[in-house]
Amino acid sequence: MESSILDSLGVEIIGVMAPVSICMFLVVLLTYSLSVTSDPQIRSAANLIYIENPSDSTTVKLEGSLANAIVFVVLIAAVTFILVLLFYYNFTNFLKHYMRFSAFFVLGTMGGAIFLSIIQHFSIPVDSITCFILLFNFTILGTLSVFAGGIPIVLRQCYMVVMGIVVAAWFTKLPEWTTWFILVALALYDLVAVLAPGGPLKLLVELASSRDEELPAMVYEARPTVSSGNQRRNRGSSLRALVGGGGVSDSGSVELQAVRNHDVNQLGRENSHNMDYNAIAVRDIDNVDDGIGNGSRGGLERSPLVGSPSASEHSTSVGTRGNMEDRESVMDEEMSPLVELMGWGDNREEARGLEESDNVVDISNRGIKLGLGDFIFYSVLVGRAAMYDLMTVYACYLAIISGLGCTLILLSVYNRALPALPISIMLGVVFYFLTRLLMEPFVVGVTTNLMMF
């Protein structure tokens, strides 16, 4: 039976929703603290066609915002296909360096501008040299934490949240109509790109899965968790070992990889003849020549930690006389103290029976990965709602969290990569306009008439 996120649903949901909630809360806090307003004259990839003016008619705003959203999605799709081609032709190092440059640019320029705005708004007494040193160290550490090995996962998670906050804070400066059309267009694009045949994101995931490689992308990875019910089974089905061959990253650090059971058994059989300290198995040798052993002993004796070369040669010569089943039975008995100590004794047979399930993805061991774009556009929606009223902020937050929970449930059912934007964004947009057009007038009316406090 395949493992599911439902086995540890609460921990998985909290591990994803907590950083999303923190990101949205800090974006709302920045919006209120810095009094962020839409800048109609801002020029970016999101408004290449039409620059919104307050004096424009509704029809002009509608047509211009729709054109901006279409162009923005087309640009994102084109860049994504370029990334697919680069990854297909093994330009992985180039992609990693590009991601590091992107992180440096976001933290250094966009984050630096927000940092200066905070200093000016709150009149923080700091000189320019100290400010530059702090910003430089903060940027360099964030850049190194993207793909460098040996970085604590908590630090990497924090920088992913920070980059989401910085980009979302800049997106909130876009005009209102353009922002809403871009959010809806991105939700639809995410749905097509991940699920449609030939979609760029689907091609990336399938290509990475076929190569058994990690995607060179900015994703938030929740800490992997294993439920108590699956812990014993996962020990047998997906043994974890520290491998120094193919699992060395660019920085030279050794990564933790999942080793299949048949690989472990094969390594164990190959190394059993090369170990300096061999376990000596002395069998009853009544049917063996008298020259091999003079003292016949009944039963089986084991000396697990004997390093004598002669004893090793004797053990090897005796072991080669048996068939493969005898070798496996001897190894089972020799390893029984270690197996019982590590709690794998009951799962040895089960592990052998699960060798054919190498392609099963164990989500409970890997954890859930959420793209940085999901953090950004969740926060953009809430930040845009914060420019109107706190009531719309509450409604949009509940809608986004509910949509994310539905996505996690679907993830556990289908056990494949799913888009995280469509459900949450659609619910958030619907809740925003329902709250703004229906709920807020009703609440304000009954409150002013002292019918509700």
Curated annotation (Swiss-Prot):
Native organism taxonomy: Eukaryota, Viridiplantae, Streptophyta, Embryophyta, Tracheophyta
Subcellular localization, as worded in the UniProt entry: Endoplasmic reticulum membrane; Golgi apparatus membrane
Assigned keywords, A-Z: Endoplasmic reticulum, Golgi apparatus, Membrane, Notch signaling pathway, Phosphoprotein, Transmembrane, Transmembrane helix
Residue ranges of the TM segments: 9-29, 69-89, 104-124, 133-153, 160-180, 181-201, 370-390, 393-413
Subunit-level organization: Homodimer. Probable component of the gamma-secretase complex, a complex composed of a presenilin homodimer, nicastrin, APH1 and PEN2.
Disordered: annotated span: 226-248, 292-329
Species: Arabidopsis thaliana
Gene Ontology annotations for the cellular component aspect, listed alphabetically: endoplasmic reticulum membrane; Golgi membrane; Golgi-associated vesicle; intracellular membrane-bounded organelle
SMART domains: PSN
Protein name listed in UniProt: Presenilin-like protein At1g08700
Family according to the record: Belongs to the peptidase A22A family.
One matching Pfam family: Presenilin
UniProt function note: Probable subunit of the gamma-secretase complex, an endoprotease complex that catalyzes the intramembrane cleavage of integral membrane proteins such as Notch receptors.
Cytoplasmic face residues: 1-8, 90-103, 154-159, 202-369, 414-417, 439-453
Lipid bilayer topology: Multi-pass membrane protein
Modification sites for Phosphoserine: 296
Lumenal-facing ranges: 30-68, 125-132, 391-392
Low complexity: bias regions: 227-240
Keyword presence, Repeat: no
